[in-house]
């Protein structure tokens, strides 16, 4: 980094991390979040760490930290419930956010994060529920009205990336079985022998060879295990060229990497909000259907929350449904879950995805360089390797570390030193410096702590 040269320090000098933090235009956003302290981490050994110092939290790819304002916002809704009961649903009730339209407090804000038109987004359910709804929803595709997955005798396969998140795998298999197909109709694109990431040209080749028999392509925007960020616009165009519907699981992409779902012509997408969008454990999810499907779309499965807002409480069986994805809403969303998401999205409104991405690229590059220096340390055979793509444009903030030594011993040693990250079996540790609240000093502390942990686990 050029700043290291300007300061006359090497990459491993803590002064570089401090200087990078001082120059960070988004540094103030950290104060918006509750950062657990060492004394709060049950696994931390307080003989090894300072009890009152912040823990090293690098697990926003699993669960984002709590925005401080979320407690206030949630308590406001509890107060509305306590003082108004059912009247909290209506504009003349005691609350400032009528529950009858509570999802509208977050829909537009979330649409900006994913690069969609407001009417293309619905906040509802959980990710896998939304995936099922989207796969059976009707849409006008290739000049015929079909669901995003309704197989025919000629076109019935589903193309996914190998080692997709298990819930996606289960959902897709169950869709196949529901339509009378078995696992042979599931095409999984795998990395080449000896590689960890999928070559997009291999996926494109499968599309070219088998596209006429593929009904739906479903990929994870950012792969949960390796951290690979797919070129969604390129893959979507190739899928459409072969007459396939293209959908995306954005669980590890939303709030992490820049997205332009509308401009990229994505057919459908779904995401959770408890990772980079910091809505809390089990938080409400999001769904997207491109506006091009709106004119000829009709919800395949329906519920009362998909009815036009001005008709919703008329309880009329002849009610008209909202167009597009909002017509897929089945039941009223949990108010507390919805406003928990609002707390985080208000912080996103203090910046933009371009600024967050710029910081993220620097944070993860700094982590990568420090980790690579640790790999190359004299006196040690390489104890791990980074399996996330080295191209910054093909990854988000996460680096996935494949351990060549005992990962359990290393992880336990990290926990004792107040590091919060996660392990995905059999031997990968995921490290995610989140630009909203992580610092360059967090990254520096992690790598120096990892060195200590590796040495401690090796000697134990």
Curated annotation (Swiss-Prot):
It comes from Monosiga brevicollis. GO terms for molecular function: kynureninase activity; pyridoxal phosphate binding. It catalyses: L-kynurenine + H2O = anthranilate + L-alanine + H(+); 3-hydroxy-L-kynurenine + H2O = 3-hydroxyanthranilate + L-alanine + H(+). Pfam families: KYNU_C. It comes from the Eukaryota. One of its GO terms (biological process) is anthranilate metabolic process. It is found in: Cytoplasm. Gene3D superfamilies: Aspartate Aminotransferase, domain 1 (3.90.1150.10), Type I PLP-dependent aspartate aminotransferase-like (Major domain) (3.40.640.10). HAMAP family: Kynureninase. The modification N6-(pyridoxal phosphate)lysine is found at residue 275. Catalyzes the cleavage of L-kynurenine (L-Kyn) and L-3-hydroxykynurenine (L-3OHKyn) into anthranilic acid (AA) and 3-hydroxyanthranilic acid (3-OHAA), respectively. Homodimer. This is Kynureninase. The lineage of its organism: Eukaryota, Choanoflagellata, Craspedida, Salpingoecidae, Monosiga. GO terms for cellular component: cytoplasm. Its cofactor is pyridoxal 5'-phosphate. The keyword Hydrolase applies. Pathway: Amino-acid degradation; L-kynurenine degradation; L-alanine and anthranilate from L-kynurenine: step 1/1; Cofactor biosynthesis; NAD(+) biosynthesis; quinolinate from L-kynurenine: step 2/3. Keywords: Cytoplasm, Hydrolase, Pyridine nucleotide biosynthesis, Pyridoxal phosphate. Belongs to the kynureninase family. Its EC number is 3.7.1.3. Pyridoxal 5'-phosphate binds at residues 127-128, 165-168, 249, 252, 274, 304, 332.
């Amino acid at each position: 980094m050029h700043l290291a040269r300007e300061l006359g320090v090497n990459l491993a000098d803590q002064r570089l991390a401090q200087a990078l933090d001082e120059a960070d235009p988004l540094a103030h956003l950290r104060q918006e979040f509750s950062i657990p302290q060492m004394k709060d981490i049950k696994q931390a050994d307080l003989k090894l760490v300072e009890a009152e110092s912040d823990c090293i939290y690098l697990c926003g790819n699993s669960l984002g930290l709590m925005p401080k304002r979320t407690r206030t916002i949630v308590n406001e809704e509890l107060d509305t419930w306590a003082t108004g009961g059912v009247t909290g649903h209506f504009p003349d009730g005691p609350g400032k956010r009528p529950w009858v339209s509570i999802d509208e407090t977050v829909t537009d804000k979330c649409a900006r994060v994913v690069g969609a038109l407001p009417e293309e987004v619905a906040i509802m359910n959980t990710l896998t529920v939304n995936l099922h709804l989207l796969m059976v929803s009707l849409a006008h595709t290739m000049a015929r009205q079909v669901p995003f997955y309704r197989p025919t005798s000629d076109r019935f396969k589903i193309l996914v990336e190998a080692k997709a998140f298990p819930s996606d795998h289960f959902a897709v298999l169950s869709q196949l079985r529901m339509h009378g197909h078995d696992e042979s109709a599931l095409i999984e694109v795998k990395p080449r022998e000896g590689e960890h990431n999928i070559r997009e040209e291999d996926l494109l080749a499968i599309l070219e060879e088998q596209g006429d028999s593929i009904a739906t392509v479903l990929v994870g925007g950012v792969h949960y295990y390796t951290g690979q960020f797919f070129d969604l616009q390129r893959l979507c165009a190739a899928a459409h060229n072969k007459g396939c519907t293209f959908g995306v699981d954005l669980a590890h992409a939303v709030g992490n990497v820049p997205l332009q779902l509308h401009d990229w012509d994505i057919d459908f997408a779904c995401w959770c909000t408890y990772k980079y969008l910091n809505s809390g454990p089990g938080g409400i999810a999001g769904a997207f259907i491109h506006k091009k499907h709106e004119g000829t779309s009709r919800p395949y499965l329906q519920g009362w929350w998909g009815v036009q807002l001005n008709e919703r409480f008329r309880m009329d069986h002849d009610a008209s449904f909202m167009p597009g994805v909002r017509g897929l809403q089945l039941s009223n969303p949990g108010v507390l879950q919805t406003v928990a998401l609002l707390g985080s999205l208000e912080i996103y409104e203090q910046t933009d995805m371009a600024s967050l991405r710029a910081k993220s690229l620097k944070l993860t590059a700094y982590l990568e360089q420090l980790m690579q220096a640790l790999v190359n340390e004299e006196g040690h055979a390489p104890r791990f390797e980074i399996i996330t793509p080295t191209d910054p444009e093909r990854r988000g903030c996460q680096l996935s570390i494949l351990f060549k030594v005992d990962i359990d011993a290393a992880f336990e040693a990290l926990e004792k030193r107040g590091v919060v990250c996660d392990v995905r079996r059999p031997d990968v540790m995921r490290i995610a410096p989140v630009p909203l609240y992580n610092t360059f000093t967090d990254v520096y502390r992690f790598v120096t702590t990892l060195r200590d942990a590796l040495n401690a686990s090796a000697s134990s």
